[in-house]
């Protein structure tokens, strides 16, 4: 059975979800969403109305209207022909949570739950989770996890970017089996853009971190120029470029892309093979990832519905306290009083902080309370994948000593943090590219 075969289950999704699945080289073999299985009827029948009514009644029902036990039996019958289940729910349609829970507990198949709000928008977070799930299924089948980039040069691409795309093709021609191998991984995040170059011996030649700014494509071009200068290399020396992060599909000179979840797992295992649980807190989301002894991602969860507990949240709190974000961590280490920030909503938490300022509480104590709230949310996320040591923290928030200290106290275990925790995703992307060509 070639390719990935997916069962789409749950509430009826919009066309965007189905399109995302098929765009990523997976087939919806079984559509068990409500009204998902379409029944045909004879248009020429003299009994067209009864035939039409029969077709409607034969559709899988919405769980609010009738029991969905029949589709569970269908799913069991197809289990040997399906690689995984994508379970879709609609926000506030809580009845589907019961079926998902039962499937999660009883099914032998990997299952991913995604929730949408029935609008036309399909966020980057859903794309990331969906791609990471499909990548994990491909890894289980021994298939390549790299996804080819579509180099459609739109009117938004600058002349420099188009030149970089041309340079990619020239690099392929220039590199022969005798030439040194250099692979670049680039992680285009919401806050920072990070890059790593590896040589053919899996050694880090150079790395770089810059602010993403308003356009991910332009920051990618800037970091390409910066890291090539650091490595004393030319563009034609690069054998392959692999992108990751939220902006991975917006980098036209990248050859292939992988999700940041897979890349963080690969990068973490390279830096420390003993790592089993990763906490990644970036600019707009946080993730907990579980690895096996081979470094494969076995489970992951994301907090991606709001900025609570992320780098953006910390930046907002720092502005409220009139403290530079780089000073917030060291400042919290001077705390002498435990203050609880009860709300993790950025707006409500800011109101709490303003109230604490009005009560003349010490800034260091408020900062410590903010870090305590972030740590509590992060550990709750980690518990969902299993708190198996050793633990590693990645992302820009790993540079905050206040958050790290509170996390280690609550975990009762040390966190492994690399010298530059923001490049772990880019490192993983480079490793995937290197494995693909060696």
Where on the chain are the PLM-derived regions?
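Glycine-rich phosphate-binding loops at beta-strand->alpha-helix junctions
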Residues: 246, 383, 387-410, 421-425
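Adenine-nucleotide phosphate-binding core of ATP-dependent small-molecule kinases
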Residues: 71, 349-382, 422
């Amino acid at each position: 059975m070639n390719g990935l075969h997916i069962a789409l289950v749950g509430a009826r999704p919009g066309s965007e979800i189905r399109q995302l699945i098929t765009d990523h080289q997976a087939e919806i073999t079984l559509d068990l969403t409500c009204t998902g299985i379409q029944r045909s009827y004879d248009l020429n029948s003299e009994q067209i109305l009864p035939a039409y009514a029969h077709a409607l009644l034969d559709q899988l029902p919405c769980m609010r209207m009738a029991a969905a036990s029949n589709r569970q039996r269908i799913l069991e019958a197809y289990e040997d022909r399906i690689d995984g289940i994508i379970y879709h729910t609609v926000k506030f349609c809580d009845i589907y949570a019961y079926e998902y829970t039962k499937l999660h507990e009883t099914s032998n198949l990997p299952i991913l739950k995604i929730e949408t709000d029935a609008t036309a928008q399909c966020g980057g977070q859903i794309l990331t989770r969906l791609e990471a799930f499909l990548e994990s299924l491909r890894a289980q089948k021994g298939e390549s996890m790299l996804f080819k980039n579509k180099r459609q040069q739109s009117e938004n691409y600058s002349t420099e970017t188009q030149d970089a795309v041309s340079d990619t093709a020239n690099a392929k021609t220039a590199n022969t089996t005798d030439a040194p191998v250099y692979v670049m991984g680039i992680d285009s995040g919401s806050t920072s853009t990070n890059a790593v170059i590896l040589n053919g011996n899996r050694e880090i030649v150079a790395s770089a971190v810059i602010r993403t700014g308003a356009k991910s494509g332009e920051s990618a071009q800037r970091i390409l120029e910066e890291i090539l200068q650091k490595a004393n290399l030319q563009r034609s020396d690069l054998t392959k470029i692999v992108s990751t992060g939220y902006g991975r599909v917006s980098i036209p000179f990248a050859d292939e892309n992988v999700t940041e979840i897979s890349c963080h797992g690969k990068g973490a295992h390279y830096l420390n093979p003993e790592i089993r649980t990763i906490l990644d807190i970036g600019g707009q989301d946080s993730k907990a990832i579980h690895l096996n002894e081979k470094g494969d991602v076995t489970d992951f969860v994301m907090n991606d519905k709001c900025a609570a507990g992320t780098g953006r949240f910390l930046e907002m709190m720092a502005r409220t306290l009139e403290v530079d974000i780089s000073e917030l961590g060291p400042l919290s280490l001077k705390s002498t009083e435990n203050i609880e920030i009860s709300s993790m909503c950025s707006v409500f938490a800011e109101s709490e902080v303003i109230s604490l300022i009005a009560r003349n509480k010490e800034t260091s104590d408020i900062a410590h309370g903010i870090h305590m709230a972030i740590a509590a949310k992060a550990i709750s996320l980690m518990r969902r994948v299993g708190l198996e040591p050793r633990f590693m923290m990645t992302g820009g928030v790993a540079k905050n000593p206040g958050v790290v200290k509170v996390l280690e106290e609550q975990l009762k275990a040390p966190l492994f943090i690399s010298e530059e925790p923001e490049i772990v995703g880019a490192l993983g992307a480079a490793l995937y590219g290197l494995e693909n060509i060696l």
